[in-house]
Amino acid sequence: MSEYMDDVDREFINCLFPSYLLQQPVAYDLWILYLQHRKLFHKLKNTNLINADENPTGVGMGRTKLTALTRKEIWSKLMNLGVLGTISFEAVNDDYLIQVYKYFYPDVNDFTLRFGVKDSNKNSVRVMKASSDMRKNAQELLEPVLSEREMALNSNTSLENDRNDDDDDDDDDDDDDDDDDDDDDESDLESLEGEVDTDTDDNNEGDGSDNHEEGGEEGSRGADADVSSAQQRAERVADPWIYQRSRSAINIETESRNLWDTSDKNSGLQYYPPDQSPSSSFSSPRVSSGNDKNDNEATNVLSNSGSKKKNSMIPDIYKILGYFLPSRWQAQPNNSLQLSQDGITHLQPNPDYHSYMTYERSSASSASTRNRLRTSFENSGKVDFAVTWANKSLPDNKLTIFYYEIKVLSVTSTESAENSNIVIGYKLVENELMEATTKKSVSRSSVAGSSSSLGGSNNMSSNRVPSTSFTMEGTQRRDYIYEGGVSAMSLNVDGSINKCQKYGFDLNVFGYCGFDGLITNSTEQSKEYAKPFGRDDVIGCGINFIDGSIFFTKNGIHLGNAFTDLNDLEFVPYVALRPGNSIKTNFGLNEDFVFDIIGYQDKWKSLAYEHICRGRQMDVSIEEFDSDESEEDETENGPEENKSTNVNEDLMDIDQEDGAAGNKDTKKLNDEKDNNLKFLLGEDNRFIDGKLVRPDVNNINNLSVDDGSLPNTLNVMINDYLIHEGLVDVAKGFLKDLQKDAVNVNGQHSESKDVIRHNERQIMKEERMVKIRQELRYLINKGQISKCINYIDNEIPDLLKNNLELVFELKLANYLVMIKKSSSKDDDEIENLILKGQELSNEFIYDTKIPQSLRDRFSGQLSNVSALLAYSNPLVEAPKEISGYLSDEYLQERLFQVSNNTILTFLHKDSECALENVISNTRAMLSTLLEYNAFGSTNSSDPRYYKAINFDEDVLNL
């Protein structure tokens, strides 16, 4: 397949899909997806599907261009705010202006309706507002919009503010009339600053009392705030997160109104917004892998990793392609999460998520009633984590390894942003869960939007736990174990809820916790794994389908396997976050990974090929564990009964002179066929009456790396392939190389000499026919099709008379060569081409002696070829569907293969060679193993090395 792919196709493929996946067997399926939409990608340069990678979140996609008046108005307002810096009016693009303007004026949802839509009656363009609107209060214009985090704080402090409404009203009555307007303008900001410390001094970062006092001072400034200082704050806002980055840490009071505080451990919880790094890359300046000695190494990795790919496609292109692997996070129907438009750039819990789930806040309700409701909610099953999963699950019968990374943008941390309230990992897909043997279940009705089904709806079937066996740990817990030995759920005997329900994330989740560094499978039995991860850390999560393990990485450092024995299960990427935490995700589609996933994958490929090459020796080593029992059996039962069970003796008992052991009962063959059988080139005796039957021996392949059987067989196959392709001179050169390599050392040269004699006989026997086919190849490659037809008539007179299809292929190729060499400016050449086309039509389409099925096929091909006459330069101008007729692949390689196979069939010779059969059979075998998810060498827990083999890329493209 790869020989027909040009550089343009490969460039698209490398941009569209992660590089490590293109080295797996799944690469074949990815190529199929691309080739099915190949025409779409070749027209992308003239469409809007490419966004030049300037707008990863999709803001402004598909919008009309701003009018000059609208652009000028937006430019003026933003320049007055001082947020455009030194960017010139001509250099800034429309999408950037819209994005920045919408940040400072969030009520504007559609600029094309407000500024650029023509009035149908007056045929005029409406402008933004009157000039008087431009002279609004400077403080109101320059005050940055509240961020999502600040909205979360408002939602948490609203109860306290409502409780003090009466006091606030009394204070307002005492204020002067001149201050009323200013107080109204900044009421929201004062409410926020009463709870938030904006001091950026690192020394006071952990001092809660000082921060509270300073917050009160800021809240008392009111309308006397300096406009210049407000403008300086606005200058720091280049995107919706810069305003947060200007704060080093924001203390969150952990009284009863803090709805997501669940333990005394988080009594010092602080909010750490994203850093001020302008880069959207996954590279991080702060590296903490959990192992201090690896910090320097990780720093070097990060400095050279996380680069942007050349993928400039819109995210919807993967939906068009039918991409069957994860590409974005799933939006939850209960609005528990805020997700960027592309589904990966930004993910955080909805600040108002808890208010949706608990009760409707009403201004008419009394403070005591609200306190009772709040206390009732906190003492019941509240949800601490908002969860989501990827849009696609992982097909375990296609993948070798799957890997993705997240970068932590902001955290709520108790350790100076060194930890986070984030859980990353994988979740079992609903249909992979086994029915429980116990009827006991714990209600999860309070956990909205976190069911196990991918659709996002709550379903009590998500409480199903795996069946089979269980083990007792003391007298306090029952663990229900999967077949591989992984605990999927744990229920306390006393009926208390488990960890997944305590925090609100799903059952059957295998995750790495950012707040304590533990790994958990949704049970109380968490295990120490690594250090916690915090802000700016890049955490990777991979699943290895070869050995059935899940592993994690931190800032490019592999942390080791976290879970094992997870074979034959279907997973989906999963993440859980508390409010105040946010992440950016990399599925490998738009950015390279920080971790060297290709190097990790190559190590497993090396193990796989090592396992294949010494597979029979591995069988011997396995038998060595039972060597004592084998000796006892031999003593008791005699050597005759033990002979069939001793793998070592079977391996050493190979008859090098008579051929394979499985051929002993076959009919007697002549010397030539016997020699072919010896090198696996003869007739396959497993076929009886055209049906493949199971052989009565365990080993049908007696090749070994310990002797010369494997290289000798390959040398015969190569010679056979060269002769089959008509490359007789190359075959002779290959024979000379074999003669030089055959060295007589203690009689070990006999096998090599047998190969040389076999190849000599094959060349001598086929030399005449090989020369004929070699001459045909030369004439076809030179485009001398007319001479080729005459040569075949002279050397094999009856061939063309009995093969009308070959005659048509040759004459059609001759017609194509004429079109390829013709000039559109020469009228005589055009006339000759038309006459030649009519001649072919009369000979192959209108001749009633030709069967109708052949005439229809000839007519279709000739119609496609005739369409090339409509183009002055068909190689450049014609669509690829018909310009392919003029390619070298069609006029040279394909034409020779058709001619060569026809000659071999006419001479009653095999039209296939042994090497091609081995390759096709190997492809079929690997495909079958993947399709049925076959076990490893001996059982389901052994590594499944065949999953790492990409035969075409690893072997055939060396």
Curated annotation (Swiss-Prot):
SUPFAM superfamilies: Concanavalin A-like lectins/glucanases (SSF49899). It is found in: Nucleus; Cytoplasm. Residues 754-835 are annotated as: Required for interaction with GID7. One of its GO terms (cellular component) is nucleus. One of its GO terms (biological process) is regulation of nitrogen utilization. The keyword Manganese does not apply. Residues 710-742 are annotated as: Required for interaction with GID8. Residues 273-289, 443-463 have a biased composition (Low complexity). Present with 1500 molecules/cell in log phase SD medium. Component of the GID E3 ligase complex recruiting N termini and catalyzing ubiquitination of proteins targeted for degradation. GID E3 is regulated through assembly with interchangeable N-degron-binding substrate receptors induced by distinct environmental perturbations. Required for the adaptation to the presence of glucose in the growth medium; mediates in association with the substrate receptor VID24/GID4 the degradation of enzymes involved in gluconeogenesis when cells are shifted to glucose-containing medium. This is GID complex subunit 1. It comes from Saccharomyces cerevisiae (strain ATCC 204508 / S288c) (Baker's yeast).
